[in-house]
Amino acid sequence: MSTSRNVPNKKNNTKQQKYQQQSQKQFKTVRATGNGEKEPFSLAMSYGHIPVVTASVHLLSSFLLRHLSFISSKEEKVFGSLTVFAAEAADKVSEHRQCLQRLINETMDSNMTSYSADVFNIQENQVKRDNGPTHYSVWYRSGNFAPNSILESNPVTLVDADAFDLIKQLTYRLGKAIFRLHNNGNSSFDIYVKDNLSNFKIYLNNLADHLEKDDIYDNFLDMVESQAKIKKDYYLNNRNLLVDNKSSNRTHHKSGDKSTVKSTDKQVEKKVEESSEKVPEVPKKIVIPKSACKPVVGGVSFAQAAGKSQTANSDTKEDQVTTSTSESTVEVKSLEVKETKEPDEEVFEDLNN
């Protein structure tokens, strides 16, 4: 039984390793040199509008790395030793931030009962994710509350801040945490956290002192300020042009729509009037008079015109006419009646064919 208690639980170890991997991904460090990764320039587009006094510790350190990496990317011919110093400073700031992130992860893993958890303000993560961190540091990740009076006197945003603004706010946050740990931290872990935070604060103060004495950094800030002013003026001018073009296009489209509506209404009215005035023409039926269907005595009948012989009928007619005039008239009438039936059928048959 005693041996089973001493055997480590493999499931718990694997879960702890996965959690550490996820926490390292969440607190992924950013470096300014070629050995690591540079801070993305999209950071300014996303968080540059936030005031420095309300920004989180994570954003303050991120924008400080961004500022130093920007200086280190310049040519040495222009800024001389400042570019080399900025690259070294970016490495040091990145190392101290890695240490700070590691302290927060250790606090969440195994030191939740220490006073450091209260200083870092460790809270449970409300958004549950698969294999994700269950806790996070409000002190490191969330913003800082500042009243309106302080915001009015300190309106500098992250994108416009220089190294002095960022270092001043970082040392202020670190100093408050160190003061609380010094007064209330009793465990060895609290002392360990306090010492690391003190080292980070000391280095930031030394960095600010060096930049303040460097005249090249002042020239760099003047150059950045002039470039920012040029970009701002260019942006405002283009924005005004776009607004003017949009307003003119809107008025043009509105007037054009009204004219087209009026023209279409007039066209519809004309079509209605034309359709009401016009009367559909009904085709007339062709009527053949009955008199045209009767044969002519002594002339050419319709049957003869169609190419049919009437020899038998003509012989009988001649014999009947020579006997007597009275009988011929009667017989001719009878023959007319007989002949009117036959030619009618033949003529209509020919017409149908």
From Swiss-Prot:
It comes from the Viruses. Residues 9-24, 321-332 have a biased composition (Low complexity). Residues 254-280 have a biased composition (Basic and acidic residues). Residues 342-353 have a biased composition (Acidic residues). Transmembrane segments: none annotated. Residues 1-24, 245-280, 305-353 are annotated as: Disordered. This is Uncharacterized protein R616.
